[in-house]
Amino acid sequence: MDLATIAFAFSLVLLSGLSTSIGGALAVGKREPGPKFMAAALGLSAGVMLYVSFMEILPEALKKLESTLGDEARATWTMMGAFFAGIAIITIIDRLVPEEINPHEPATTEEEARRKRLIKTGMFTAFALAIHNFPEGFATFLSGLEAPEIAIPVAVAIAIHNIPEGIAVAVPLRSATGSRKKAFWWATLSGLAEPLGALIGFALLMPFIGPMTFGISFAVIAGIMVFISLDELLPTAEETGEHHCAIYGLIAGMAVMAVSLALFI
Protein backbone atom coordinates (compact mmCIF):
# COMPACT_ATOMS: atom_id res chain seq x y z
CA MET A 1 0.00 0.00 0.00
CA ASP A 2 1.73 3.19 -1.19
CA LEU A 3 1.72 6.65 0.36
CA ALA A 4 -0.29 8.15 -2.53
CA THR A 5 -3.19 5.75 -1.88
CA ILE A 6 -3.18 6.53 1.84
CA ALA A 7 -3.06 10.29 1.12
CA PHE A 8 -5.95 9.98 -1.36
CA ALA A 9 -8.11 8.06 1.12
CA PHE A 10 -7.36 10.50 3.94
CA SER A 11 -8.11 13.50 1.68
CA LEU A 12 -11.57 12.09 0.96
CA VAL A 13 -12.24 11.69 4.68
CA LEU A 14 -10.99 15.19 5.46
CA LEU A 15 -13.13 16.81 2.77
CA SER A 16 -16.29 14.89 3.72
CA GLY A 17 -15.73 15.64 7.42
CA LEU A 18 -15.15 19.34 6.87
CA SER A 19 -18.45 19.65 5.03
CA THR A 20 -19.98 20.34 8.45
CA SER A 21 -18.41 23.77 7.96
CA ILE A 22 -20.71 24.26 4.95
CA GLY A 23 -23.65 23.65 7.26
CA GLY A 24 -22.11 26.06 9.74
CA ALA A 25 -21.70 28.71 7.05
CA LEU A 26 -25.31 28.28 5.93
CA ALA A 27 -26.51 28.57 9.53
CA VAL A 28 -24.63 31.79 10.22
CA GLY A 29 -25.46 33.32 6.84
CA LYS A 30 -28.49 35.43 6.07
CA ARG A 31 -30.41 32.67 4.33
CA GLU A 32 -30.78 29.01 5.23
CA PRO A 33 -31.44 26.35 2.56
CA GLY A 34 -35.13 25.83 1.85
CA PRO A 35 -37.04 22.68 2.82
CA LYS A 36 -37.28 21.39 -0.77
CA PHE A 37 -33.52 21.65 -1.25
CA MET A 38 -32.79 19.97 2.09
CA ALA A 39 -35.29 17.15 1.45
CA ALA A 40 -33.87 16.44 -2.01
CA ALA A 41 -30.23 16.64 -0.83
CA LEU A 42 -30.82 14.30 2.11
CA GLY A 43 -32.80 11.90 -0.09
CA LEU A 44 -30.00 11.96 -2.66
CA SER A 45 -27.45 11.09 0.01
CA ALA A 46 -29.61 8.22 1.29
CA GLY A 47 -30.08 6.89 -2.25
CA VAL A 48 -26.33 6.87 -2.88
CA MET A 49 -25.61 5.14 0.43
CA LEU A 50 -28.30 2.48 0.07
CA TYR A 51 -27.49 1.65 -3.54
CA VAL A 52 -23.73 1.44 -3.07
CA SER A 53 -24.14 -0.61 0.13
CA PHE A 54 -26.32 -3.32 -1.42
CA MET A 55 -25.06 -3.29 -5.01
CA GLU A 56 -21.32 -2.74 -4.57
CA ILE A 57 -19.94 -2.88 -1.02
CA LEU A 58 -21.66 -6.11 0.12
CA PRO A 59 -20.82 -8.01 -3.10
CA GLU A 60 -17.22 -6.80 -2.78
CA ALA A 61 -17.15 -7.95 0.85
CA LEU A 62 -18.45 -11.38 -0.16
CA LYS A 63 -15.84 -11.69 -2.91
CA LYS A 64 -12.98 -10.92 -0.52
CA LEU A 65 -14.30 -13.26 2.16
CA GLU A 66 -14.70 -16.08 -0.37
CA SER A 67 -11.10 -15.61 -1.52
CA THR A 68 -9.93 -16.02 2.08
CA LEU A 69 -12.35 -18.62 3.46
CA GLY A 70 -12.63 -20.62 0.24
CA ASP A 71 -16.26 -21.50 0.94
CA GLU A 72 -19.28 -19.53 -0.29
CA ALA A 73 -21.57 -20.52 2.59
CA ARG A 74 -19.05 -19.54 5.28
CA ALA A 75 -18.28 -16.30 3.45
CA THR A 76 -22.00 -15.46 3.19
CA TRP A 77 -22.63 -16.08 6.90
CA THR A 78 -19.54 -14.06 7.84
CA MET A 79 -20.66 -11.19 5.62
CA MET A 80 -24.18 -11.21 7.10
CA GLY A 81 -22.79 -11.27 10.64
CA ALA A 82 -20.47 -8.34 9.91
CA PHE A 83 -23.29 -6.39 8.21
CA PHE A 84 -25.59 -6.65 11.23
CA ALA A 85 -22.64 -6.02 13.55
CA GLY A 86 -22.19 -2.70 11.75
CA ILE A 87 -25.85 -1.89 12.34
CA ALA A 88 -25.47 -2.88 16.00
CA ILE A 89 -22.39 -0.67 16.46
CA ILE A 90 -24.04 2.45 15.07
CA THR A 91 -27.30 1.64 16.92
CA ILE A 92 -25.46 1.48 20.25
CA ILE A 93 -23.71 4.78 19.54
CA ASP A 94 -27.05 6.29 18.54
CA ARG A 95 -28.77 5.04 21.72
CA LEU A 96 -25.99 6.14 24.06
CA VAL A 97 -26.13 9.74 22.85
CA PRO A 98 -29.33 11.47 24.06
CA GLU A 99 -31.14 13.70 21.61
CA GLU A 100 -31.60 16.60 24.00
CA ILE A 101 -29.80 17.99 27.01
CA ASN A 102 -31.25 19.90 29.93
CA PRO A 103 -29.29 22.58 31.80
CA HIS A 104 -28.07 21.46 35.23
CA GLU A 105 -27.65 24.89 36.78
CA PRO A 106 -30.63 27.12 37.59
CA ALA A 107 -30.75 30.43 35.74
CA THR A 108 -31.81 33.77 37.14
CA THR A 109 -34.14 34.73 34.29
CA GLU A 110 -36.13 32.97 31.60
CA GLU A 111 -33.95 34.52 28.89
CA GLU A 112 -30.78 33.41 30.67
CA ALA A 113 -32.20 29.90 30.99
CA ARG A 114 -32.95 29.86 27.27
CA ARG A 115 -29.45 31.11 26.44
CA LYS A 116 -27.77 28.46 28.62
CA ARG A 117 -29.98 25.76 27.17
CA LEU A 118 -29.11 26.76 23.61
CA ILE A 119 -25.37 26.92 24.34
CA LYS A 120 -25.41 23.48 25.95
CA THR A 121 -27.55 22.10 23.15
CA GLY A 122 -25.15 23.37 20.48
CA MET A 123 -22.00 22.18 22.25
CA PHE A 124 -23.49 18.83 23.21
CA THR A 125 -24.72 18.35 19.64
CA ALA A 126 -21.17 18.97 18.41
CA PHE A 127 -19.84 16.38 20.87
CA ALA A 128 -22.55 13.85 19.99
CA LEU A 129 -21.95 14.25 16.27
CA ALA A 130 -18.21 13.86 16.78
CA ILE A 131 -18.79 10.46 18.42
CA HIS A 132 -21.31 9.55 15.73
CA ASN A 133 -18.99 10.57 12.87
CA PHE A 134 -16.05 8.54 14.16
CA PRO A 135 -16.97 5.24 12.39
CA GLU A 136 -18.03 7.13 9.25
CA GLY A 137 -14.50 8.50 8.92
CA PHE A 138 -12.97 5.05 9.11
CA ALA A 139 -15.55 3.69 6.65
CA THR A 140 -14.68 6.31 4.05
CA PHE A 141 -10.95 5.88 4.63
CA LEU A 142 -11.06 2.10 4.23
CA SER A 143 -13.09 2.43 1.03
CA GLY A 144 -10.51 4.88 -0.33
CA LEU A 145 -7.68 2.45 0.36
CA GLU A 146 -9.26 -0.46 -1.45
CA ALA A 147 -11.85 0.81 -3.96
CA PRO A 148 -11.68 4.47 -5.08
CA GLU A 149 -14.67 4.00 -7.42
CA ILE A 150 -16.75 3.27 -4.32
CA ALA A 151 -15.02 5.73 -2.02
CA ILE A 152 -15.65 8.89 -4.06
CA PRO A 153 -19.49 8.65 -4.18
CA VAL A 154 -19.53 7.45 -0.56
CA ALA A 155 -17.50 10.50 0.48
CA VAL A 156 -19.86 12.78 -1.45
CA ALA A 157 -22.90 11.17 0.19
CA ILE A 158 -21.40 11.55 3.67
CA ALA A 159 -20.45 15.15 2.88
CA ILE A 160 -24.07 15.95 1.96
CA HIS A 161 -25.25 14.18 5.11
CA ASN A 162 -22.81 16.26 7.21
CA ILE A 163 -24.20 19.62 6.03
CA PRO A 164 -27.41 19.51 8.12
CA GLU A 165 -25.31 18.25 11.05
CA GLY A 166 -23.26 21.44 10.82
CA ILE A 167 -26.48 23.45 10.79
CA ALA A 168 -27.71 21.57 13.88
CA VAL A 169 -24.58 22.59 15.78
CA ALA A 170 -24.37 26.20 14.60
CA VAL A 171 -28.00 27.36 14.84
CA PRO A 172 -28.44 27.13 18.64
CA LEU A 173 -24.96 28.53 19.29
CA ARG A 174 -25.54 31.49 17.00
CA SER A 175 -28.89 32.18 18.63
CA ALA A 176 -27.49 31.94 22.17
CA THR A 177 -24.16 33.76 21.81
CA GLY A 178 -24.80 36.06 18.86
CA SER A 179 -21.34 35.04 17.60
CA ARG A 180 -21.32 33.75 14.04
CA LYS A 181 -17.62 32.92 14.32
CA LYS A 182 -18.07 30.64 17.36
CA ALA A 183 -21.06 28.91 15.78
CA PHE A 184 -19.13 28.29 12.56
CA TRP A 185 -16.02 26.89 14.28
CA TRP A 186 -17.98 24.56 16.54
CA ALA A 187 -19.75 23.18 13.46
CA THR A 188 -16.38 22.70 11.75
CA LEU A 189 -14.82 20.96 14.75
CA SER A 190 -17.67 18.45 14.97
CA GLY A 191 -16.69 17.12 11.53
CA LEU A 192 -13.02 16.64 12.40
CA ALA A 193 -13.93 13.41 14.22
CA GLU A 194 -14.08 11.73 10.80
CA PRO A 195 -10.38 12.17 9.90
CA LEU A 196 -9.54 11.33 13.52
CA GLY A 197 -11.54 8.10 13.22
CA ALA A 198 -9.68 7.29 10.00
CA LEU A 199 -6.27 7.79 11.61
CA ILE A 200 -7.03 5.77 14.75
CA GLY A 201 -8.75 2.98 12.82
CA PHE A 202 -5.86 2.73 10.37
CA ALA A 203 -3.26 2.71 13.17
CA LEU A 204 -5.07 -0.11 14.98
CA LEU A 205 -5.85 -2.25 11.94
CA MET A 206 -2.77 -1.64 9.75
CA PRO A 207 -1.00 -4.85 10.90
CA PHE A 208 -4.10 -6.90 10.06
CA ILE A 209 -5.06 -5.36 6.70
CA GLY A 210 -5.73 -8.04 4.10
CA PRO A 211 -8.64 -9.61 2.16
CA MET A 212 -10.31 -10.93 5.34
CA THR A 213 -10.03 -7.56 7.11
CA PHE A 214 -11.35 -5.71 4.07
CA GLY A 215 -14.20 -8.19 3.61
CA ILE A 216 -15.41 -7.90 7.20
CA SER A 217 -14.84 -4.13 7.29
CA PHE A 218 -16.77 -3.57 4.06
CA ALA A 219 -19.75 -5.51 5.41
CA VAL A 220 -19.62 -3.51 8.66
CA ILE A 221 -19.41 -0.28 6.65
CA ALA A 222 -22.48 -1.30 4.62
CA GLY A 223 -24.42 -1.91 7.84
CA ILE A 224 -23.44 1.49 9.22
CA MET A 225 -24.43 3.25 6.00
CA VAL A 226 -27.79 1.49 5.73
CA PHE A 227 -28.64 2.42 9.32
CA ILE A 228 -27.65 6.07 8.79
CA SER A 229 -29.79 6.22 5.65
CA LEU A 230 -32.89 4.70 7.25
CA ASP A 231 -32.60 6.17 10.74
CA GLU A 232 -31.25 9.66 10.01
CA LEU A 233 -31.26 10.82 6.42
CA LEU A 234 -34.73 9.76 5.28
CA PRO A 235 -36.53 10.70 8.53
CA THR A 236 -34.79 14.09 8.52
CA ALA A 237 -35.78 14.59 4.88
CA GLU A 238 -39.39 13.72 5.76
CA GLU A 239 -39.37 16.22 8.63
CA THR A 240 -39.03 19.04 6.09
CA GLY A 241 -42.59 18.27 4.96
CA GLU A 242 -41.43 17.75 1.37
CA HIS A 243 -42.09 14.03 0.97
CA HIS A 244 -41.96 13.93 -2.82
CA CYS A 245 -38.72 15.91 -2.98
CA ALA A 246 -37.17 13.41 -0.57
CA ILE A 247 -38.30 10.45 -2.70
CA TYR A 248 -37.17 12.10 -5.95
CA GLY A 249 -33.80 12.75 -4.32
CA LEU A 250 -33.61 9.12 -3.15
CA ILE A 251 -34.29 7.79 -6.65
CA ALA A 252 -31.88 10.29 -8.20
CA GLY A 253 -29.17 9.22 -5.75
CA MET A 254 -29.62 5.58 -6.72
CA ALA A 255 -29.60 6.46 -10.42
CA VAL A 256 -26.46 8.59 -10.13
CA MET A 257 -24.73 5.83 -8.19
CA ALA A 258 -25.78 3.16 -10.70
CA VAL A 259 -24.52 5.19 -13.67
CA SER A 260 -21.26 6.18 -11.97
CA LEU A 261 -20.49 2.57 -11.02
CA ALA A 262 -21.31 1.40 -14.55
CA LEU A 263 -18.89 3.99 -15.97
CA PHE A 264 -16.09 3.16 -13.54
CA ILE A 265 -16.33 -0.64 -13.71
Swiss-Prot record:
Binding site for Zn(2+): 136, 161, 165
Pfam name, any one: Zip
Binding positions for Fe(2+) per the UniProt entry: 133, 136, 162, 165, 194
Main localization of the protein described in the UniProt heading: membrane
UniProt entry keywords in alphabetical sequence: Cell membrane, Ion transport, Iron, Membrane, Metal-binding, Transmembrane, Transmembrane helix, Transport, Zinc, Zinc transport
Catalytic activity: Zn(2+)(in) = Zn(2+)(out)
Top-level taxon of origin: Bacteria
GO MF annotation terms: metal ion binding; zinc ion transmembrane transporter activity
Keyword set includes Oxidoreductase: no
Membrane-spanning residues: 6-26, 37-57, 77-97, 122-142, 150-170, 184-204, 208-228, 245-265
Family: Belongs to the ZIP transporter (TC 2.A.5) family. ZupT subfamily.
Annotated HAMAP family: ZupT (MF_00548)
Listed name of the protein: Zinc transporter ZupT
Lineage of the species this protein comes from: Bacteria, Bacillati, Actinomycetota, Actinomycetes, Mycobacteriales
